[in-house]
UniProtKB/Swiss-Prot annotation:
The lineage of its organism: Eukaryota, Metazoa, Chordata, Craniata, Vertebrata. Glycans are attached at residues 135, 141. The gene is Scnn1b. This is Epithelial sodium channel subunit beta. Residues 72-530 are extracellular. It comes from Rattus norvegicus (Rat). Ubiquitinated. Can be ubiquitinated at multiple sites and undergo monoubiquitination and polyubiquitination. Ubiquitination by NEDD4 or NEDD4L inhibits the ENaC channel through endocytosis, intracellular retention and degradation of its individual subunits. However, some studies could not confirm the ubiquitination of this subunit of the ENaC. N-glycosylated. N-glycosylation is required for interaction with BPIFA1. Residues 1-50, 552-638 are cytoplasmic.
């Protein structure tokens, strides 16, 4: 019950309102507010009132303008970048090493046999077109060639370039097509790409035949390797005990067993040291060469795949623990026959994230499915870009590219199942829209670690020590008394911290909420002499104004409803006799005849009779003497 009474009281208070008029509220506010200016408006003479009103209005506008500037600056989410230096014992970076050739030619020769013969015939046509004979191409398998052939574009007449088939019609007839040859100065090699039905064809031009041949060979090799099982591809690569000859971390010996294998399609079998997936990351005791990682690698250059790997050396990359190594984009080469020393400096990048920076903390707010999540690695923008491209490949070409992970239920592209995949892939790769779409959807990681490298090289081994070093390494790996290694196939690496000083580049908000409140309060106090309480007072008067306005509107609506006019009486006014009869007609019978002479019959008289209600008998109208009423009251009391 007390709660009900309290609620009813509150309801009545709301319905009643503040109890003031607009003018009374304004006068009360000007008399009681702590803001400078309003009190002078009502206390001074007419001229000063006008002057103080204009000054108060002007300064109020200045305060609102300054507030708008500060709020806009705060909502721009600007950041300030600070650089700090630190010194501490740091974890040694993860080191990924690969061979430039993804496979051993001796193990993939049976897969590339037809492609190798076709490639030799292509080079013969490019280098010596007039000396080539028909019988040299009669044994070639043109199944691969017909999907994506190389052509010659004769540009001796720039206004009318002529496209020539590199082999003419020699694989279909005994006579070559006329005019199907031209010299190297007048022709350029291009790749012809056609859709499945052959109605749409484009040409990918190159400035050099070397680029055209290499690109075409990699495209055809991708078609072949995409149809091989992953475990078979791993077996065709370089084994860890064949590529890693010696390992030393600080003063502790290590071997290929301390490396985690991973298959990278561009470089085959790669091996990661100190990845930190199953073991704790190794710290570096001190800066300097003696406390880093020393490796001797055998790249086996004599077993490289022709045309697929034109660079001899080791490919390596330094990265943070539990991150996927994107060696093709971020790796470096170490040349064979040299000792490469890599000094490392550490930079830590720490971003604020949304809304200050367009970065992500863990990739959970990125709309792209991370195809590298199966490796249990952290998010990176390269993983997002590759996943985005693979998603576009599947959507546009109905298959995935061999170089990137494949979503569940999808298949890799190949000429047998997807005849026009090369046309679709290269069109998508050259699409600016695709790149911009992926760049807009992917975000940089807010927290990143970058390793700045200083690289120096020297010949290794020297001529004086080459013989005994190669003998020892051959004995350790092959148990052979003869030299089984070559200087052209070995690489020595020294990776170490130059110093333990590290830099932290950190973002911080340039304008935080404390900055905003202090500036808002400073401007309000400077121009108006007010505080937060003054704003509360102003808010109170605004609420009262709204309250009064609502009550007035409600009352006005109710008054309109009450004053709504009723339908007017259409008949003539009744006479005195009719009124008397109405009061004495206790049966409420309608009149059938009129008492007036020359009475006219109105149609509404029968339908709208005057009610005959007798006057009420009120006890209060009974007049009695005062003493009689008092006696009656006494009797009732008794």
């Amino acid at each position: 019950m007390p709660v009900k009474k309290y609620l009813l009281k509150c309801l009545h208070r709301l319905q009643k309102g503040p109890g003031y008029t607009y003018k009374e509220l304004l006068v009360w506010y000007c008399n009681n507010t702590n803001t400078h200016g309003p009190k002078r408006i009502i206390c001074e003479g007419p001229k000063k009132k006008a002057m103080w009103f204009l000054l108060t209005l002007l300064f109020a506008c200045l305060v609102c303008w300054q507030w708008g500037v500060f709020i806009q600056t705060y909502l721009s989410w600007e950041v300030s970048v600070s650089l700090s230096m630190g010194f501490k014992t740091m974890n040694f970076p993860a080191v990924t090493v690969c061979n430039s050739s993804p496979f051993q030619y001796s193990k993939v020769k049976h897969l590339l046999k037809d492609l190798y013969k076709l490639m030799e015939a292509v080079l013969d046509k490019i280098l010596a077109p007039k000396s080539s004979h028909t019988n040299t191409t009669s044994t070639l398998n043109f199944t691969i060639w017909n999907h994506t052939p190389l052509v010659l574009i004769d540009e001796r007449n720039p206004d009318h370039p002529v496209v020539l088939n590199l082999f003419g019609d020699s694989h279909n007839s005994s006579n070559p097509a006329p005019g199907s040859t031209c010299n190297a100065q007048g022709c350029k090699v291009a790749m012809r790409l056609c859709s499945a039905n052959g109605t749409v064809c484009t040409f990918r031009n190159f400035t050099s035949a070397t680029q055209a041949v290499t690109e075409w060979y990699i495209l055809q090799a991708t078609n072949i390797f995409s149809q091989v099982l992953p475990q078979d591809l791993v077996g065709m690569g370089y084994a860890p005990d064949r590529i890693i000859l010696a390992c030393l971390f600080g003063t502790e010996p290590c071997s290929h067993r301390n490396f985690t294998p991973i298959f990278y399609p561009d470089y085959g079998n790669c091996y990661i040291f100190n990845w930190g997936m199953t073991e704790k990351a190794l710290p570096s005791a001190n800066p300097g060469t003696e406390f880093g990682l020393k490796l001797i690698l055998d790249i086996g250059q004599e077993d490289y795949v022709p045309f697929l790997a034109s660079t001899a050396g080791a490919r390596l990359m330094l990265h943070e623990q539990r991150t996927y190594p994107f060696i093709r984009e971020e790796g470096i080469y170490a040349m064979a026959g040299t000792e490469t020393s890599i000094g490392v400096l550490l930079d830590k990048l720490q971003g604020k994230g949304e809304p200050y920076s367009p970065c992500t903390m863990n990739g959970s707010d990125v709309a792209i499915q991370n195809l590298y999540s199966d490796y249990n690695t952290t998010y990176s923008i390269q993983a997002c870009l590759h996943s985005c491209f693979q998603d576009h490949m599947i959507h546009n070409c109905s298959c995935g590219h061999y170089l990137y992970p494949l979503p569940a239920g999808e298949k890799y592209c190949n000429n047998r199942d997807f005849p026009d995949w090369a046309y679709c892939y290269l069109s998508l790769q050259m699409s600016v829209v695709q790149r911009e779409t992926c760049l807009s959807m992917c975000k940089e990681s807010c927290n990143d670690t970058q390793y700045k490298m200083t690289i120096s090289m020297a010949d290794w081994p020297s001529e004086a020590s080459e013989d005994w070093i190669l003998h020892v390494l051959s004995q350790e790996r092959d148990q052979s008394s003869n030299i089984t290694l070559s200087r052209k196939g070995i690489v020595k690496l020294n990776i170490y911290f130059q110093e333990f000083n590290y830099r932290t580049i950190e973002e911080s908000p340039a304008n935080n909420i404390v900055w905003l409140l202090s500036n808002l309060g400073g401007q309000f106090g400077f121009w108006m002499g007010g505080s937060v309480l003054c704003l509360i007072e102003f808010g109170e008067i605004i609420i009262d104004f709204i309250w009064i306005t609502v009550i007035k509107l409600v009352a006005s609506c109710k008054g309109l409803r009450r004053r709504r006019p009723q339908a007017p009486y259409t008949g003539p006014p009744p006479t005195v006799a009719e009124l008397v009869e109405a009061h004495t007609n206790f049966g409420f019978q309608p009149d059938t005849t009129s008492c007036r002479p020359n009475a006219e019959v109105y149609p509404d008289q029968q339908t709208l009779p005057i009610p005959g209600t007798p006057p009420p008998n009120y006890d209060s109208l009974r007049l009695q003497p005062l003493d009689t009423m008092e006696s009656d009251s006494e009797v009732e009391a008794i």
